């Protein structure tokens, strides 16, 4: 079968990398339900675009629209992968996954778990013994169970942490029910275990941030309006964006959220490729507390929860300011119904202070140019935390990836007056929040002036001949194989890494390059023999470089949910020790936040910035922003006022 003209119009596909539309998702589900997934027991984990091969895209050949689907058959308690040809109407591949593989959770499975816990007789009775009888105020928060050496016998499990509210709008995180965990089997559809250990008094002090609890808002801050009277400087055609010298395509997947494709920079009229594909690959949040419940908190928010599905519908004026372009995100619920996250991705421009300036004191003249950046973002809510993910593109060719962490701490209970060395007391009523980390990995499929790239490590070194003691230099070392490219940051050596193209030379006959500035380059704090370290080995180092393989997509492997970490992921792929010199390669950078909790993080956390920079390093022959015009501002009378020129 092929899509008819009416369906094609609904699909709205203009490029092979465009995400699947709702029509295409519905079609893929229908094809699967008419075929191998006909049974009512099947649940859909994800249906997304099967991206064409890079060779086909470069060649410009016609490619079929295909969908990758992941499903679970609850009756068999087994998982499957499928490839669907949307134009032919066929299932081209149907693969039974290994018995121990558990795909990510779906959003409606979280609601299913909470509802089942609230109705379970054993749970109700156990809570009643703790004096909690109004189940409408009890909140069950499903987490992944992780892996701690146990045999879960192929069961697809969630573990629910439990909190309680004083009233409907009260923050439940102020009132954790400690040492009380409910295990729910999604395939069996029932509670299978209850861990009800030492009861600790539920903290009663509130921790609310809603206006009705906080009181009147301050009135001394005057309006700060963002105006662009001539509109935004970007042009959008479908999912293709051009802005200043940048061009790229916007993508969205249930697993990664925002994806950037075919990132190019126009230099002297030529579109030069920089990165073929860039996205969040994985993240893990391990907790450092030894308390029984807290010690098993280590969520892989991308690989276990499909963080793209948790994207917010963004609101003008609150999440993004200025002239905004939104992109919707399409996904599927567990029953195969397409659904849309409206305004899942936000794109806008921001002023970014000065870009360059010089005052010629001899002539008494100054030249200043202001910077601006293009911001492409999405924000995901993962239970208590919010993660805002940003790609920033700058006029000088720089790129920034930034995570802004906010939301509410994951809290725990202790006896009033206790001081837990593994966390911060938030009040004197027994509430604390454990120390933890937020570890992120970003995958960047570089294509710097072409496919054949290489990576250098650059360290500061002192020469042997150094009579004044002031000499130091930057020394490049080529990373030749995957094993040699497993690296850690080193601030003492001012280390950074360069991605270069030996076949493309700049003005001084050096390979063109970009450099990765490894800010926030922390590593996993857990011991190497800890289960979370074995599962999140990507977080034990900061830099990984692999030879391109389209099947190697996620740093902790394709399916980290309940996985041991022994079979998949960067640490497995790099054992091949493939050549990474003058070849198609992928750069993976791990960074994070070591979150030592403070009182100011409660009851809602001021955002914390975590990220890194990519900067051109000999990619251009000179500063590429010399052609920027002098800037103007608008006065209160509405007249243009030149704010960046001589004599002002």
From Swiss-Prot:
* Residues bearing PTM 2',4',5'-topaquinone: 385
Cystine pairs annotated here are 320-346
Residue ranges that the Swiss-Prot or TrEMBL entry lists as coiled coil: none
The entry's free-text remark on the cofactor is: Binds 1 copper ion per subunit. Can also use zinc ion as cofactor. Contains 1 topaquinone per subunit.
Cross-referenced PROSITE patterns: COPPER_AMINE_OXID_1 (PS01164), COPPER_AMINE_OXID_2 (PS01165)
Excised during maturation, the propeptide residues are 1-9
Give the catalytic activity.
Answer: a primary methyl amine + O2 + H2O = an aldehyde + H2O2 + NH4(+)
What exactly does this protein do?
A: The exact function of MaoXI is not known.
PANTHER family per the UniProt record, alphabetical = COPPER AMINE OXIDASE (PTHR10638), COPPER AMINE OXIDASE 1-RELATED (PTHR10638:SF86)
Protein name (database record): Primary amine oxidase
Q: Give the gene that encodes this protein.
A: maoI
């Amino acid at each position: 079968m092929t899509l008819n003209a009416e369906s094609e119009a609904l699909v709205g596909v203009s490029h092979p990398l465009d995400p699947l539309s709702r029509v295409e998702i519905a079609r893929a589900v229908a094809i699967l339900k008419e075929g191998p997934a006909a049974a009512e027991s099947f649940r859909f984990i994800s249906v997304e675009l099967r991206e064409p091969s890079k060779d086909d895209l470069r060649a410009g050949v016609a490619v079929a629209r295909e969908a990758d689907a992941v499903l679970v058959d609850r009756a068999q308690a087994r998982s499957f992968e499928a490839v669907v040809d949307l134009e032919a109407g066929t299932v081209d591949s149907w693969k039974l996954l290994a018995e121990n593989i558990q795909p990510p959770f779906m959003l409606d499975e979280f609601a299913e778990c909470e509802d089942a816990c609230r109705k379970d007789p054993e749970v109700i009775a156990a809570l009643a013994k703790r004096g909690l009888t109004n189940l409408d105020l009890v909140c069950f928060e499903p987490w992944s169970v992780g892996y701690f050496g146990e045999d879960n016998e192929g069961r697809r499990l969630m573990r629910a942490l439990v909190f309680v509210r004083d009233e409907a709008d009260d923050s439940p995180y102020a009132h954790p029910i400690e040492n009380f965990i409910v295990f729910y089997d999604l395939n069996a559809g029932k509670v299978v275990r209850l861990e009800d250990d030492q009861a600790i008094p539920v903290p009663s002090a509130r921790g609310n941030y809603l206006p009705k609890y906080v009181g009147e808002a301050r009135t001394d801050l005057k309006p700060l309006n963002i105006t662009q009277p001539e509109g935004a400087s970007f042009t959008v055609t479908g999912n293709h964006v051009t802005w200043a010298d940048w061009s790229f395509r916007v993508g969205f997947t249930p697993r990664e959220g925002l994806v950037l494709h075919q990132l190019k920079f126009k230099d002297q009229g030529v579109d030069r490729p920089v990165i073929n594909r860039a996205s969040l690959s994985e993240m893990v949040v391990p907790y450092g507390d030894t308390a029984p419940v807290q010690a098993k908190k280590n969520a892989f928010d991308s690989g276990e929860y499909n963080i793209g599905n948790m994207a917010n519908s963004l609101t003008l004026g609150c999440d993004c300011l200025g002239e905004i372009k939104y992109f919707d995100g399409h996904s599927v619920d567990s029953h195969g119904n397409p659904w849309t996250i409206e305004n899942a991705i936000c794109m806008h421009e921001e002023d970014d202070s000065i870009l360059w300036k010089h005052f010629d004191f001899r002539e008494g003249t100054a030249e200043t140019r202001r910077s601006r950046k293009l911001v492409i973002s999405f924000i995901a809510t993962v239970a208590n935390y919010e993660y805002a993910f940003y790609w920033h593109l700058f006029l000088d060719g720089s790129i920034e990836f930034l995570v802004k962490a906010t939301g509410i701490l994951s809290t725990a209970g202790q006896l009033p007056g206790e001081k837990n060395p593994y966390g911060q007391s938030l009040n004197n009523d027994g509430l604390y929040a454990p120390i933890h980390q937020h570890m992120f990995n970003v995958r960047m499929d570089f294509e710097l002036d072409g496919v054949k790239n290489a990576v250098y490590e650059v360290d500061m070194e002192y020469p042997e001949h150094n009579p004044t003691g002031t000499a130091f230099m930057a020394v490049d070392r080529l990373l030749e194989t995957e094993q040699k490219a497993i690296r850690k940051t080193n601030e003492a050596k001012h280390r950074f890494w360069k991605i270069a193209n030996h076949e493309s030379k700049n003005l001084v006959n050096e390979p063109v390059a970009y450099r990765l500035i490894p800010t926030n380059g922390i590593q996993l704090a857990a011991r190497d023999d800890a289960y979370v370290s074995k599962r999140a080995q990507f977080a034990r180092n900061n830099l990984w470089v692999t030879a391109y393989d389209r099947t190697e997509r996620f740093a902790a492997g394709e399916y980290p949910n309940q996985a041991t970490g022994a079979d998949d992921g960067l640490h497995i792929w790099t054992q091949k020790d493939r050549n990474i010199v003058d070849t198609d390669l992928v750069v993976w950078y791990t960074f994070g936040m070591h979150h030592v909790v403070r009182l100011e993080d409660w009851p809602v956390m001021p955002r914390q910035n975590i990220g890194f920079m990519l900067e051109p390093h000999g990619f251009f022959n000179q500063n590429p922003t010399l052609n920027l015009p002098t800037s103007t501002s608008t006065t209160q009378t509405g007249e243009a006022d030149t704010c960046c020129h001589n004599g002002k």
